[in-house]
Amino acid sequence: MLIIESVLLLRQHIRRLRQEGKRIALVPTMGNLHDGHMKLVDEAKASADVVVVSIFVNPMQFDRVDDLARYPRTLQDDCEKLNKRHVDFVFAPTPAEVYPQGTEGQTYVDVPGLSTMLEGASRPGHFRGVSTIVSKLFNLVQPDVACFGEKDFQQLALIRKMVADMGYDIEIIGVPIVRAKDGLALSSRNGYLTADQRKIAPGLYKVLSAVAEKLAAGDRQLDEIIAIAEQELNEKGFRADDIQIRDADTLLELTDASQRAVILMAAWLGQARLIDNRIVTLAQ
């Protein structure tokens, strides 16, 4: 496994791989890797000849300076995990390498609608930062396929739209959520939880599942369903942040024509903002 820190060296290797006709897969990450990331790597390995994992804590997608400062940096441990998975390349640049002129004057990629709705409404600039860095990585790595987790459902939808709108010839693979045995979705931010909070955390998935059962049974009283879910979260020790029930294919509000719903749930538990989602097939 080769660890690359410079754009110049990355381009040299990508050029060689292209000349050799290799199929390239990209797994973009911010590091602090867990089993969910390893599932992305496994999917990438099954889909290509060469796997490139990027590790970059992207300052453009953080709406709070303190959140950026405390995000875990575990590069050595991450590389050890990736080496055991037989990843070919790790691209781990510094912010100065990615944004030589800083982020203020950086050209950006914005996906209208999807970047400012739902999660984007509460985190201004977040999705613009995501689409910009992903677009930049696509240009640098030139992958044939890229793997993203379905836990960040809106992010995945945004990337798919960006790829379609910008004409990228890249297959986007959404990889299902990986959960702990107690149901908690794996996330780098789970590390912010205290031992007591970790015991409470699976309650998010329990509330999510209860909402899913109601929808699957034909209940369409969405405001009431959401209000009950918020109350249940708060009673369990969370601070409910946002619960949305949307069309899984458009992320717009449900209509009579909607075939699938996605439940998007976010709640604070101590210093950790936990997110999760479930897709429900609607009875027609």
Curated annotation (Swiss-Prot):
Keywords: ATP-binding, Cytoplasm, Ligase, Nucleotide-binding, Pantothenate biosynthesis
Principal location: cytoplasm
Top EC group: ligase
Entry keyword annotation includes Cell cycle: no
Locations listed in the record: Cytoplasm
Subunit comment: Homodimer.
Pfam family, one: Pantoate_ligase
Top-level taxonomic group: Bacteria
GO BP of this protein: pantothenate biosynthetic process
Family named by the database record: Belongs to the pantothenate synthetase family.
Pathway(s) annotated for this protein in UniProt: Cofactor biosynthesis; (R)-pantothenate biosynthesis; (R)-pantothenate from (R)-pantoate and beta-alanine: step 1/1
Extra remark: The reaction proceeds by a bi uni uni bi ping pong mechanism.
Binding site for (R)-pantoate: 61, 155
Catalytic residues (UniProt): 37 (proton donor)
Chain's role: Catalyzes the condensation of pantoate with beta-alanine in an ATP-dependent reaction via a pantoyl-adenylate intermediate.
Gene this protein is translated from: panC
Protein name: Pantothenate synthetase
Gene3D superfamilies, sorted: HUPs, Pantoate-beta-alanine ligase, C-terminal domain
EC number: 6.3.2.1
Binding site residues for beta-alanine: 61
